[in-house]
Amino acid sequence: MNGMTRRERQVFDINEIIKILDKSKVLHLGLVDGDEPYVVPMNYGYIMEDGKLTIYLHGANRGRKLDLIRANPKVFFELDCDIVPFEGDVACNYGITYASIMGRGIAEIVEDVEEKKLALSVLMKTQTGKDFEFEEKMTKIVTIIKINTLE
């Protein structure tokens, strides 16, 4: 995969990446539906361990997203924050500043109850900053998607 055109804007520092992950609230998940792209916005949680990013998503127990992941687990994701539009004297001077993360990964549907409980706790911590605990019965009403990031 090619890198960014504006390489001076690329973020490599793990602490900066974590700041973006903590500030953002919506991840755009890119999937493949046959020969068509399909993107869905989702809440997420993450674990950064030894420089490796693992992302957890949750959703309904059935639907298009799960069908697509089962057919092709290769995914692309994007999330952004700090969106600030700016103006100029001419049209070409208008723009937006933002921070974002994009990457590829392999998605898997989590079946293990303990990992599902962990994923839900991580997701809620990322979204709210609060700690929550989940009982086994709560894990049965949602599907957890785990993205093992590749970059």
Short names for language-model regions:
Residues 20-21, 68-69, 123:
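A generic structural signal for nonpolar/aromatic side chains embedded in well-ordered alpha-helices
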Residues 1-22:
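Extreme N-terminal tail/first-helix region
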Residues 32, 43, 60-62, 80-82, ...:
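Histidine- and/or cysteine-centered catalytic micro-motif in compact active-site loops
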Residues 2-6, 83-151:
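Charged, gly/pro-rich active-site loop segments
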Residues 53-75:
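Compact nucleic-acid interaction/catalytic patches
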Residues 24-61:
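Short beta-strand segments
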